[in-house]
Structure formats: C-alpha cells, structure tokens
Regions:
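Catalytic cores and adjacent flexible loops of soluble metabolic enzymes
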Residues: 1-320
Length: 320
C-alpha cells in the first residue's frame, strides 16, 4: 500500500512530469520504448521523482501507450520514483491494478456538455465511475493512490466560463467517493492567476489534510503565472512536461502543458526546494529532439539559460 504522505510529503512541493502521458497525446511521432526509458532515467538522474507514465487505453487507438506496462516496470525499478497512469473505465482500472502502478489517475469533466461530448456520459455517471475505481482499489492487493482530475475546471471548450461552485461540488463528490486527492485542470488554458488562486484556495480549504494538485496548460502564455498563483494559494503538487510537450484536442494551436523546466525554476525562485538539477533537466531535451524530430519544444530556460550562465548541453546542441 502506497501512502499519500510518503509520496507527496506535507509542506513540500512535488512536481510531476506528465510528458510521457499528457505530452504524447497529440504528437505525430512518439518516442520508442527505449527512448521513453532514457527520458525517464535521465530525468530521474536530474532529481525528478514523479512521472505520469502513460494511459491504460486501447492500443489500437492510442499506440503511443501500447508499452505502458513496460514503462510502469521501468519507473518501479528506480528507487524512490513514483509512477502514475491514467485509467478512464473499469477495464482500464483493472489493467492498471494488474500492472502494479503506484497511482491511478482518472478524470471528471467540470461541465455536463463536455462530459457528454468527451466521455459520452453524464457527470453523475463519471462520479459513479470514480467510486467504482476506488472500490476496485480498496479490494486490490497493493492499493495504489487514486486521484481524480476535474478537467475544464477553469474554463470549458464548449460552454466557456465555468461556475467555480460547480467545480467545488464535483471535488467534494470525488473526495466522498474515496479518492486520495483531486487535481484541478485548466485543460484548455483559459484561466488567469486571479481565477486560479481563488479556486485553488477554496479547494485547498475543503481538502483538509489531503494535498491538491493543479494541472495547467500554457495555451495563452499564462501557465507560469498561474502556477505561481496556485503555489501562493496552497497547492503543493504541480504538473508540467519537458519542453512544454502536449496540447489539447479541444484547443487547436495550444502550446501544451506548462514547461517542466521553467516550472522547476519558478518553484526554486519562490523558495520551494525541488531537489531537481535544472541544467541536467534541460539537457534531457536532447532525447526528445532525437526521438521526435520536428516536434516543437518550448521553454524560457532552454532559450535564455539560467541567470548565472548557460544551461549547458541544451544551448550547445541548439547552436551546433
């Protein structure tokens, strides 16, 4: 049994690399299994400890995650590393449980319209699915952590603005269903710092001793500012992807997740120790360039370097 407090210690910021899952949803060419393993091991060498490694979805539709079981084994072999995988239905949950992954993530849409369009089910059915996931977790041998992400929590691609009270109600229902914590997702990058701070603060208060995760996209260039607001509001788990990999099928042209290396720099600059070596982290981008040629990578640090000097391998590779 994995204890939440052991994986996400109180008072410490935990940064999760979601590039191996969320970052690969829309790419035209995805890394080989060996490439993913090098990516993860090199980030681990830089100090990263939390990895969203893939999804338990049909390989015929999502071939980029066909090797998820192998990647789960890879992260499990790294001392102190923590693997997370997405599962959206009972079949996926059972496969995730069989894999031994340490944490299972699932999703509930903030709006009825998006829930029907994206998952072909109502929000009530989505909550019932969360409850069933928790029941299966409780009946399993290793009892992984379960988190529920509220997608479109800060703006919906279909309805536009989202009532924060509706999001808070869904968070409450997910906690009642048995999840270990919730993640607030600005799926299409609609929000600004004020909105992120206010919603995060409300959810931190209602979550009590349970941590709160904030998952942000940089669609309109507000990702880092929003992450800063989330930290100020009490969130202690943040998601990002190396090079800002990712995107959203509901936001054409979106630049993807918050750049992971810039997120590390933000946390360190605000006084939150991450244990991550930024120069080593930036150097891992070379693997992505090799495995996914033509894929655009973003990032202020990779472009400009650290304030006290260049970022090493990344800047040399860019000028070569």
């Amino acid at each position: 049994m994995t204890r939440v407090q052991d994986v996400y210690p109180d008072g410490r910021v935990s940064l999760r690399e979601v590039g191996l899952r969320d970052g690969l949803q829309l790419v035209k060419k995805f890394p080989s299994t060996a490439g993913k393993q090098r990516w993860m091991r090199d980030e681990y060498g830089a100090g990263v400890r939390h990895f969203e490694v893939g999804s338990f979805l049909p390989a015929s539709t999502f071939p980029q995650f066909a090797d998820v079981r192998e990647i789960v084994k890879t992260v499990a072999a790294l001392p102190g590393a923590h693997g997370i995988a997405l599962a959206l239905n009972e079949r996926g949950v059972n496969e995730a449980l069989a894999s031994g992954v340490a944490e299972i993530a699932t999703v509930v849409s903030a709006t009825e319209e998006h829930s029907q369009a994206n998952a072909n089910r109502s929000r009530a059915q989505a909550i019932a699915n969360v409850k069933r996931l928790c029941e299966l977790r409780d009946a399993s041998a290793h009892k992984p952590i379960v988190n529920a992400a509220i997608s479109m929590a800060l703006g919906c691609s279909i309805t536009g603005p989202v009532d924060p009270n509706e999001v808070i109600k869904l968070v409450e229902k997910c906690l009642e269903a048995g999840v270990d914590f919730v993640a607030v997702a600005d799926t299409v990058g609609y929000a600004g710092p004020k909105q992120v701070g206010e919603l995060t603060s409300a959810i931190v208060k209602m979550s009590g001793a349970k941590p709160v995760c904030v998952h942000l996209h940089d669609t309109r260039g507000m990702g880092i500012a929003n992450a800063s607001a989330a930290l100020d509001a009490g969130a202690r788990i943040l998601d990002g992807s190396l090079g800002g990999l990712g995107g959203c099928p509901f936001a054409p042209g979106a630049t993807g997740n918050v750049v992971f290396e810039d997120l590390v720099f933000l946390c360190e600059s605000k006084g939150f120790a991450t244990g991550i070596d930024i120069e080593k982290l930036v150097a891992v981008r070379a693997i992505l360039r090799s495995e996914m040629p033509g894929e655009t990578l973003y990032g202020g640090l990779a472009r400009a370097g650290l304030p006290n000097g260049p970022t090493g391998g990344e800047r040399q590779a860019r000028s070569a």
